[in-house]
């Protein structure tokens, strides 16, 4: 994985973990995501890329009562707080409009081979968010842009705009105009 190769090239001490993406769900959630726990000066941090939904924009220190990270609560990004129960960790997310459980994981190193069945499930299961629609997210210096299923959300400068992409042409136009992704064919 590219993220792990980058961490390794900079000499970081890290290990992969298997993550459940909760996003406030009260239903049982299958673990389908990979993140890394990086240790710096004896402190473990949750680091994540490629989540496709609101993921931490900074490494989150896994210290109980650490407070929100980053400290500034913004409508454009979620701030995170770690809740630890032994080796079990839940990260709570908060922005100006929502506060909810975001991800959970166990502080146990995973092997990359452990992700093969998770990747298969995420790409094939009817209940997987990946098979239910498009997931795209991009961070900018002023906010985020995302498409989840058929909803386009653009956040910048403390404002958020949402709109439903009603047709395939609307989706293709948004992918091109907002993300620079050109889709051809059906």
Explain the meaning of each model-derived region.
Residues 1-18, 36, 136:
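Cysteine-centered nucleophilic/redox motifs
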Residues 19-163, 169:
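His-Asp-centered catalytic microenvironments across diverse enzyme cores
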Residues 168-186:
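Generic C-terminus detector
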């Amino acid at each position: 994985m590219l993220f792990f190769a980058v961490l390794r090239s900079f000499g970081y001490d890290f290990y992969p973990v298997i993550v459940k993406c909760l996003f406030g769900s009260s239903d049982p959630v299958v673990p389908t995501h990979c993140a890394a726990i990086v240790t710096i000066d004896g402190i473990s941090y949750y680091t994540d890329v490629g989540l496709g939904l609101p993921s931490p924009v900074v490494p989150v220190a896994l210290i109980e009562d650490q407070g929100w990270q980053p400290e500034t609560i913004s409508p454009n990004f979620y701030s995170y707080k770690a809740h630890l129960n032994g080796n079990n960790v839940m990260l709570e997310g908060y922005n100006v409009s929502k506060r909810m459980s975001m991800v959970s994981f166990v502080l146990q190193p995973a092997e990359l081979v452990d992700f093969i069945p998770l990747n298969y499930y995420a790409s094939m299961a009817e209940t997987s968010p990946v098979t239910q629609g498009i997931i795209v997210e991009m961070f900018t210096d002023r906010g985020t842009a995302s498409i989840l299923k058929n909803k386009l959300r653009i956040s910048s400068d403390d404002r958020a705009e949402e709109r439903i992409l009603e047709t395939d042409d609307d989706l293709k136009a948004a992918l091109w105009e907002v993300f620079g992704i050109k889709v051809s064919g059906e």
